């Protein structure tokens, strides 16, 4: 016999925070740690002087990947303003030093110059936990905090932000 109160409580929790129920852990602990460390990185740690509250200094994109390998369905692109381009794979592998590619670094600089245009369609959030999705999840960090948007392609600014991201991934031969 199914307890209707238990079902009602679960549905209520799901409606309040769907991300709890979407967090399918087909990712390694190392991946989660690398990803969270990137999201926790502050402009103070970088000794960076930001010009305004809309200047983005960190961009993190969780990108779904077509893969038959369990634990390898997501890759995260991490861009640190003027410094680094990294890719973290859900299985825990990390590819670093991609900023050595001059074209990739130029694409990253273009992203940081242009991505603040998308902030007004994003949500300032404290929730950065990983979850699976068929869409790219974008996190842009400013002095005010982390802005989030799941890129569904519904708006011009979403498509623009995804295009900026793909310009970087194409230069580092990232396979989605």
Predicted regions span which residues?
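Short, well-ordered, aromatic-rich surface patches in folded extracellular/luminal domains
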Residues: 2-61, 132-176
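Short, surface-exposed coil-to-beta transition loops
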Residues: 70-77, 133-134
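Short, solvent-exposed coil/turn segments at beta-strand boundaries
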Residues: 78-86, 143-145
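Short, flexible beta-strand-to-coil junctions
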Residues: 62-73, 142-144
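Acidic/histidine-rich, surface-exposed loop or edge segments in extracytoplasmic proteins
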Residues: 85-98
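Short, internal acidic amphipathic alpha-helical interface segments
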Residues: 103-135
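Long, positively charged binding patches that form subdomain-scale interaction surfaces
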Residues: 63-65, 92-93, 102-105
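Short, charged, low-complexity patches
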Residues: 100-108, 112, 158-166
């Amino acid at each position: 016999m199914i307890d209707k109160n238990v079902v009602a409580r679960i549905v209520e929790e799901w409606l309040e925070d769907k991300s709890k129920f979407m967090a399918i852990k087909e990712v390694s602990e190392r991946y989660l740690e690398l990803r969270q460390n990137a999201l926790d990185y502050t402009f103070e740690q970088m000794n960076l002087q930001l010009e305004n509250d809309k200047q983005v200094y960190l961009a993190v994109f969780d990108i779904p990947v077509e893969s038959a390998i369990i634990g390898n369905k997501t890759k995260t692109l991490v861009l640190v303003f003027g410094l680094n381009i990294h890719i973290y794979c859900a299985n825990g592998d990390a590819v670093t030093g991609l900023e050595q590619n001059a074209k990739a670094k130029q694409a990253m600089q273009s992203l940081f110059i242009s991505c603040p245009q998308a902030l007004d369609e994003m949500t300032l959030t404290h929730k950065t936990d990983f979850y699976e999705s068929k869409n790219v999840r974008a996190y842009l960090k400013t002095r005010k905090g982390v802005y989030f948007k799941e890129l569904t392609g519904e708006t011009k600014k979403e498509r623009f932000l995804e295009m900026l991201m793909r310009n970087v991934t194409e230069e580092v031969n990232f396979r989605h």
